[in-house]
Amino acid sequence: QKVMRRTFVIAIFIVLFILSTALMDSASSQDKPIVLKLGHAVAPEHPYHLGAVKYSELVAQRTKNKVKIDVYPSTQLGNERDMVEGLQLGTIDLVVTSTGPLGGFVPKMFIVDLPFLFRDREHAYKVLDGPIGRDLLDAFAAKGIKGLAFWENGFRQITNNVRPIEKPEDLKGIKIRTMENKVHLASFRAFGASPTPMAWSEVYTALQQKTIDAQENPIAIIYFQKIYEVQKYLALTG
């Protein structure tokens, strides 16, 4: 079975509402382009960023340059939780984030972080692109946020500096970084690991200084964030 983490694109609902009005005004008054901020947590080489840049290009093209989206990678606008809060405050317009922090805003989102929830990639797409996924996205409206779509982040793999991980018991005693997510914490405790919540921006240094032993992420993040420089073992747990 597979563990799949799917990413989540969200934007403030009120910004989308104002945007339609502003575009009509802009068309008649020739005002400057509307500039929106889009933030995410990973490196500029990651598919998140490449997709966000392409998205900004398409928006500019289809609005005839009336709307411009500036993309901020690598937690420039804060960690993922900070950026979601920024949506509510109106300081950020769009965010691409993992599902990890979202249960703190909409509790039903914790369901997608359960281990072994999906049989395979096709199953995940069918669920999240269907009525269940739409219901999860719509739940954010009550928080002043508009859920737009799910993006794929990949399968979760574990890296560590202690020993090869070949079976669940091998996780016993390993201090592994997780997000501040009660499902993640409970899952790793059940395997005997010692989960340690930590902001993503602190993980590389924490691994380097041996404050933690391990972390888990899809291969793209492990590669583009250069986690291999500070980790010895990779377990394809996804």
Language-model features, listed with the residues they occupy:
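A short hydrophobic/aromatic micro-motif that marks alpha-helical segments and, especially, helix-coil
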Residues: S20, D135-L136
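N-terminal secretory/targeting leader peptides
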Residues: S28-H123, P131-I132, D138-G238
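Short, low-complexity disordered leader/linker segments with a strong preference
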Residues: Q1-V35
